[in-house]
A protein has these predicted regions:
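Single-stranded RNA-binding regions, centering on S1/OB-family and related RNA-binding modules
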Residues: 1-148
Length: 148
């Protein structure tokens, strides 16, 4: 089962001119040709990030995203529309921050601290309304202590 917004190890099942199809339990999810690791063969596994493209199709990318589902990350605003802002996630598709999820007006170049979530249609999205996920518990580490 594919998990949108997560990294997964998937098996290469067939090669095509547009790339390689990875096993998703159905017809396969496309990893574009430009991102296919050299030497990848049928039945090899590859780690990919799963997302929806602009048309809603499920896609895979070997590019490293700046965050995955449920992460709180700082992302740059790339474009602003009347409905919200697009944030650079480091993959072929930017993540959308809907105007109802924006705390302050967004301008291109701004950095927004957001949580990566799934929207009502199951697509990866962002919210700037993150207070309910933050914890003000007292820190139990000492200065210069390494944390995971």
């Amino acid at each position: 089962m594919l998990l949108i917004g997560k990294k997964q190890r998937l098996k290469a099942i067939r090669f095509a001119p547009e790339g390689v199809f990875l096993d998703d339990g159905a017809e396969g999810v496309l990893l574009p040709r430009k991102q296919v690791p050299a030497g990848l063969r049928t039945d090899d596994e590859v780690e990919v990030f799963i997302y929806n493209d602009g048309d809603g199709a499920i896609m895979a990318t070997a590019m490293e995203p700046k965050g995955v589902l449920d992460d709180i990350v700082a992302l740059e605003v790339i474009n602003v529309t009347p409905n919200g802002a697009y944030l650079q996630l480091g993959i072929p598709k930017d993540v959308f921050l809907h105007k109802s999820q924006i705390r302050n007006i967004a301008e291109p170049g701004d950095i927004k601290v957001v949580k990566l979530i799934l929207d009502y249609d199951g697509r990866l999205a962002a919210t700037e309304l993150i207070e309910s996920w933050l914890d003000n518990a007292e820190l139990t580490v000492v200065e210069k202590e390494q944390v995971a």
